[in-house]
Regions:
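Multi-pass, polyprenyl lipid-linked donor-dependent membrane glycosyltransferases
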Residues: 98-102, 119, 140-172
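Membrane-lumen/periplasm interface segments of specific transmembrane helices
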Residues: 38-41, 82, 225-257
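Short hydrophobic alpha-helices at membrane interfaces in multi-pass membrane enzymes
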Residues: 168-194
Length: 257
């Protein structure tokens, strides 16, 4: 009994040390990306229209016909509204474009968690390569994530979603169809809808939505299907409404709608 109690205490002590090391790693990443979000180089398009579009939203909200003043304002992005909301200009007298850095931090924590899981299981999976790819992308954009460019927002959201998606798939790929989870994939699909409102060119990734859709249809979860469709429309509606008000088109610069 004494030996078992001693072994239990040793296990608890080891777990606390590992847990403390993980939290220290995340704290270090937070400081690193806070530093990266405070200085660096601006994306060319930020000087051209990103920063101005965000400032327009800060000062006036949605301005009908704004794309007539500058055609680039028609490239509406959900990231601009998010950046305007968290710019906190009133606090220091100038905007703090730090949301891209926060998204980068989330992606970095996801990559770190993936690599720690690899170190623990000592077995290579597809998700491990995605974690390495995410780290390379973060290194590439580190000096420019101070810029509120929609390109960075979209890529960071996609990296996070795809890494999470593949990890889920790896965990249950041998499960029968009826036992596969639907909620995590459906919720990740809502993030993909948001990514499409950040950068319209990412809309092709919405094809992944077919996977949870098929699972839900096979399991005949009609109420959940209706709920997820409603949430997707709720996410997309503000973006579509701003498009119509700013440019007159539903999907600028495409003029067929």
């Amino acid at each position: 009994t004494e030996r078992s109690d001693e072994g239990l205490e040793n296990s608890k002590s080891l777990w606390r040390k590992k847990n403390k090391a993980v939290w220290l790693l995340y704290a270090g990443l937070t400081l690193l990306f806070a530093y990266g979000s405070s200085r660096g180089y601006m994306h060319y398009d930020t000087g051209l229209y990103h920063a101005q579009a965000i400032r327009w939203i800060e000062e006036y909200g949605v301005v009908p016909g704004l794309a007539n003043l500058h055609s680039r304002f028609g490239y509406n992005s959900a990231s601009f509204a998010l950046s305007a909301f968290f710019s906190e200009t009133w606090l220091i007298g100038r905007p703090m474009h730090c949301v891209a850095g926060f998204f980068a931090l989330l992606c970095a924590c996801k990559c770190a968690a993936g690599l720690m899981a690899f170190w623990k299981r000592k077995k290579v999976r597809i998700s491990d390569f995605l974690s390495i790819g995410g780290i390379f992308y973060l290194i590439a954009v580190f000096r420019e994530m101070v810029s509120p460019a929609s390109d960075y927002f979209a890529m960071l959201v996609l990296f996070w979603v795809i890494m999470t998606w593949v990890e889920l798939w790896e965990q249950e790929r041998d499960c029968p169809i009826g036992e596969k989870q639907t909620v995590p994939y459906a919720l990740l699909s809502l993030y993909l809808v948001y990514a499409a409102t950040v950068k319209l060119s990412t809309a092709v990734i919405l094809l992944l939505v077919l996977y949870p859709a098929v699972l839900l249809l096979r399991q005949k979860k009609w109420l959940q299907i209706a709920g997820y469709i409603a949430l997707g429309l709720l996410i997309a509606f503000p973006y579509l409404a701003r498009n119509v008000l700013i440019s007159g088109w539903l999907f600028y610069p495409f003029t067929f709608l």
